[in-house]
Amino acid sequence: MINGDIILFALMVVTGVNLARYLTALRSLIYIMREAHPLLYQQVDGNGFFTTHGNVTKQVRLYHYLKSKEYHHHHDEVFTGKCDRVRELFVLSVSLTGVTLLAAFLL
């Protein structure tokens, strides 16, 4: 029989891998954003986004931009595709984190 600790460990590994995928896609989105949408790049503090002194308010601006799908009106297909990917990976990472936390409390 499969032990509960093994299930929890497997969920944690899958969540960690998907979180790494999300952060990598977010980093590449910010890199593409520099050329495709310079105004948004400045609004979300593109240079300091992943630093320890990053402005959380500006990071939330990117979250709302992706949540409301404002990027659908953009002319660059690479940028809109990357925004879709980051949005999907964010939803997947948050849901996997929730499932992992639920499993940790139940097991």
UniProtKB/Swiss-Prot annotation:
Protein's UniProt keywords contain Cell membrane: yes
InterPro entries: Universal_stress_protein_B
First and last residue of the signal peptide: none
Record GO cellular component, one term: plasma membrane
Transmembrane region(s): 6-26, 86-106
Pfam families: UspB (PF10625)
Family recorded in the similarity comment: Belongs to the universal stress protein B family.
The protein's name: Universal stress protein B homolog
Organism the protein comes from: Vibrio vulnificus (strain YJ016)
Protein encoded by which gene: uspB
